[in-house]
Amino acid sequence: MEFEAVIGLEVHVELLTETKIYCGCSTAFGSEPNKHVCPVCLGLPGSLPRLNKKVVEYAIKAGLALNCSINNKSRMDRKNYFYADCPKNYQITQQEIPICREGFIEIRNHLGEKKRIGIERIHMEEDAGKLIHTDEGTLIDYNRAGIPLIEIVSKPDIRTSKEAVSYLEDLRNILKFIGVSDCKMEQGSLRCDCNISIRPKHNLKLGVKTEIKNMNSFKALEKAIQYEYKRQSDLIESGEKVRQETRRWNDAKNVTEVMRSKEYANDYRYFPEGDLTAINISDNYIDNIRKTIPELPDKKIDRFVEEFKISRKEIEILILNMEIGDFFENAAKLSGDPKSVSNWITGDISRLAKETGIPLNNLNFTERDLAELIEFINCGVISNNIGKKVIEEMFYKGKSPRQIIHEKGFVQNSSKEKILKVVKEVMEENPKSIEDYKKGKKKAVKFMIGMVMKKTKGNANPMLVNKLVEEEIGKY
């Protein structure tokens, strides 16, 4: 029997606010344990929460970017459960009236075709503390307690592990692009739970779903779905039943493991949060937030592909964040050579950024500087190899290409007489290479060209060097 998976994702996203959702404690990551805490986020008796307005703004901004409707009236609810990392023994979240509902994003499948994935709801909530297990016992860091989250719940429109990864990647890109989260999975600011069931293909009846947790990377999400699909398929084909339960992905063993039987909403005894008033959002407030949303990644990609005639794959790398996309666009227009701009950004500039840890959106030079460098290369003032040396100086010292070329004496030598003199010297010094050429060894020509470039310290015009070497060696 052939089965298909029915998959929905619940994505928890930490918002880039300076303070927590219900108090004024800092949200700074990586501080010493329990430094950013107060009576409110520790759940001490008598402490009262106050909703952070920036959290509401960012939740609405995310909802609009994800094509959601925004509820003009919303409220917070208590979700009651007892666990060590939840100091109040309840979480302030949204159950009945979430801030956003009925949205969608469009992903691309393996054929490059668009597929719409529905978003059921987006709601605001607080994060829990962090448990740290040691040989002596379990410690609790409450710095994370009260960090503002939005939970984005997709509809069960996803059918494969590849689609799930594509959805999560697109979601991450949008949220980073609009500046509401840094979406760093390695720091836990983007976390994903997966609900998956299987059913016979072309059968509309849903199967019993399993929730999978502890997937800390896109690869883990893909592998967990593939494993769970096979596990459930094997159970059904052997006549056994799939149980509704929560499972944990074990990255070391590449398996899912049982955590607990699946809870239902009434297990949490939700009821309205009495310490916070209802949230009233005007249409004017929503419209003002809408105006702050930039051109989103998918539309920008389509426009760049059409306008600059370079591949979608290259463009996807160039717009990983808004600043890089804007840098590329401005440099492409200034230089009139978008392909070269793309090559420099995705090549040498990205390499230098990775080696130094300097982010691409914090470069020492401007779009005009890169356009000027490309113009010098295209006009033959310097070679592409010299351009690589210039870009390093630009990257580290922030000088303009013109200044670097002048200071270093990098101007390309295009004098036929001077280059021909070096070519003849190289041939006199390497008679064996000439003999190799006579025997049909084409590598001898490349060797000669390399030696000429070495002698001229890379300043010779490479096209002229090629031409003169081939002409001279052909005389032997």
From Swiss-Prot:
<dbReference type="GO" id="GO:0050567">
    <property type="term" value="F:glutaminyl-tRNA synthase (glutamine-hydrolyzing) activity"/>
</dbReference>
<dbReference type="InterPro" id="IPR017959">
    <property type="entry name" value="Asn/Gln-tRNA_amidoTrfase_suB/E"/>
</dbReference>
<dbReference type="InterPro" id="IPR017958">
    <property type="entry name" value="Gln-tRNA_amidoTrfase_suB_CS"/>
</dbReference>
<dbReference type="InterPro" id="IPR004413">
    <property type="entry name" value="GatB"/>
</dbReference>
<dbReference type="GO" id="GO:0050566">
    <property type="term" value="F:asparaginyl-tRNA synthase (glutamine-hydrolyzing) activity"/>
</dbReference>
<dbReference type="Pfam" id="PF02637">
    <property type="entry name" value="GatB_Yqey"/>
</dbReference>
<keyword id="KW-0547">Nucleotide-binding</keyword>
<dbReference type="GO" id="GO:0070681">
    <property type="term" value="P:glutaminyl-tRNAGln biosynthesis via transamidation"/>
</dbReference>
<keyword id="KW-0436">Ligase</keyword>
<dbReference type="InterPro" id="IPR014746">
    <property type="entry name" value="Gln_synth/guanido_kin_cat_dom"/>
</dbReference>
<dbReference type="InterPro" id="IPR042114">
    <property type="entry name" value="GatB_C_1"/>
</dbReference>
<keyword id="KW-0648">Protein biosynthesis</keyword>
<dbReference type="Pfam" id="PF02934">
    <property type="entry name" value="GatB_N"/>
</dbReference>
<comment type="function">
    <text>Allows the formation of correctly charged Asn-tRNA(Asn) or Gln-tRNA(Gln) through the transamidation of misacylated Asp-tRNA(Asn) or Glu-tRNA(Gln) in organisms which lack either or both of asparaginyl-tRNA or glutaminyl-tRNA synthetases. The reaction takes place in the presence of glutamine and ATP through an activated phospho-Asp-tRNA(Asn) or phospho-Glu-tRNA(Gln).</text>
</comment>
<dbReference type="InterPro" id="IPR018027">
    <property type="entry name" value="Asn/Gln_amidotransferase"/>
</dbReference>
<dbReference type="InterPro" id="IPR023168">
    <property type="entry name" value="GatB_Yqey_C_2"/>
</dbReference>
<dbReference type="InterPro" id="IPR003789">
    <property type="entry name" value="Asn/Gln_tRNA_amidoTrase-B-like"/>
</dbReference>
<keyword id="KW-0067">ATP-binding</keyword>
<protein>
    <recommendedName>
        <fullName>Aspartyl/glutamyl-tRNA(Asn/Gln) amidotransferase subunit B</fullName>
        <ecNumber>6.3.5.-</ecNumber>
    </recommendedName>
</protein>
<dbReference type="GO" id="GO:0006412">
    <property type="term" value="P:translation"/>
</dbReference>
<dbReference type="GO" id="GO:0005524">
    <property type="term" value="F:ATP binding"/>
</dbReference>
<comment type="similarity">
    <text>Belongs to the GatB/GatE family. GatB subfamily.</text>
</comment>
<dbReference type="InterPro" id="IPR006075">
    <property type="entry name" value="Asn/Gln-tRNA_Trfase_suB/E_cat"/>
</dbReference>
<comment type="subunit">
    <text>Heterotrimer of A, B and C subunits.</text>
</comment>
